[in-house]
Regions:
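Membrane-proximal N-terminal soluble sensing/regulatory segments of transmembrane proteins
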Residues: 1-48, 52-196, 206-222
Length: 226
């Protein structure tokens, strides 16, 4: 965290200042050859690098904390949708089973052909279609959770971009599927979870930009220590 960083940075700065003071006293003692001048420059470069690293690490800590918080909230929303979809899939399957049971009884009676056809139409056009959509809702919610976990570990800008494009596509489909939930209470619950997932791309900076910034900071820190 930032407190630990500040404490460690202060120790390094104090050591660097001690080195600078030592070199200064060496000059005062009359040592002033080229090697000492070179050490002076190395000391100044070291101090400048330490300050730059400290600034970058401070930025990294803040960005990392922000990303972790946003991903945690979005993972909770994705898991909530997945849990909700379990109930919706079960309800849809129960509805389809009930219609199939009725259909089995109807087809045994010749004088109820029209009712049989109506039941078959409902099974195909409503119950099975609803079950398919709820299955997809569960699948997309689970995939969204996996993508969010992958984002926190993404190691290249291209990987972040791929996750962003894939996740945004998933969220668009999830939004359509949640709007198709017939139960108003569960539809409202799903809508609240979707608000969090939609904000993934809407915030500025969003989670993808934050991850890209972290990768850039890592590259800058790496270049300083080379």
């Amino acid at each position: 965290n930032q407190v630990i960083r500040e404490e460690e940075a202060q120790k390094l700065f104090e050591q660097a200042e001690t080195l600078r003071d030592t070199l200064k006293r060496t000059h005062e003692y009359g040592y002033d050859d080229a090697r000492l001048t070179s050490l002076d420059q190395l000391a100044e470069d070291l101090i400048a690098t330490l300050h730059e690293q400290n600034t970058l690490v401070a930025q990294r800590i803040d960005l990392s904390a922000s990303l972790t918080s946003d991903i945690r909230d979005s993972l909770a929303a994705a898991q909530g949708l997945s849990d909700l979809s379990e109930t919706l899939v079960s309800n849809a399957a129960s509805g389809a089973t009930a219609v199939i049971s009725i259909l089995s009884e109807l087809i045994e009676e010749q004088d109820r052909i029209d009712e049989s056809m109506d039941a078959l139409d409902r099974l195909l056009e409503e119950d099975l279609y609803l079950m398919e959509r709820m299955f997809e809702l569960r699948l997309r919610a689970s995939q969204t959770g996996l993508l969010l976990n992958q984002l926190s570990r993404a190691a290249t800008p291209d990987e972040v971009l791929w996750i962003e494009e894939t996740l945004e596509k998933n969220v668009r489909i999830l939004e359509r599927r949640t709007l198709g939930i017939s139960d108003p209470v569960r539809r409202r619950q799903a809508g609240q979870m979707m608000t969090q997932l939609i904000s993934l791309s809407g915030d500025t900076p969003n989670v993808f930009e934050t991850r890209q910034s972290l990768l850039e900071i890592d590259r800058e820190i790496g270049s300083l220590v080379e």
